[in-house]
């Protein structure tokens, strides 16, 4: 679960192959669903670029969702380590850090 700069929450639905978007105020409610085949799992948010990053474990990819429009826009998926489980983003540089199931492997993806 991550929060964006608008105070919305993004949650991965691994079994449903989607990212779910929620508004919290005045009461919590789902405001969006983005279908992502490939078992979305890890999630990170870059507030500078207003981009959500999601790992797709079944495809060995990470994909960005641009959130600066009314409807999230998918970026081109990027290949990653085997079964990427976690992702982090350095908002100063846009650099991504991805780890998977291989012991000791950290992939760094430059913007």
Identify what each model region corresponds to.
Residues 1-111:
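Predominantly soluble domains enriched in secretory-pathway, periplasmic, or organellar proteins
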């Amino acid at each position: 679960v991550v929060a964006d700069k608008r105070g919305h929450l993004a949650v991965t639905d691994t079994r449903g192959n989607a990212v779910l978007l929620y508004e919290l105020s005045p009461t919590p409610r789902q405001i969006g669903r983005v279908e992502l085949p490939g078992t979305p799992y890890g999630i990170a948010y870059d507030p500078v670029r207003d981009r959500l990053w999601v790992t797709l474990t079944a495809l060995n990819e990470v994909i960005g969702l641009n959130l600066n429009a009314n409807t999230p826009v998918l970026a081109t998926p990027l290949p990653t380590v085997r079964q990427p489980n976690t992702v982090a983003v350095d908002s100063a540089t846009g650099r991504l850090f991805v780890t998977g199931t291989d012991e000791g492997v950290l992939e760094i993806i430059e913007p």
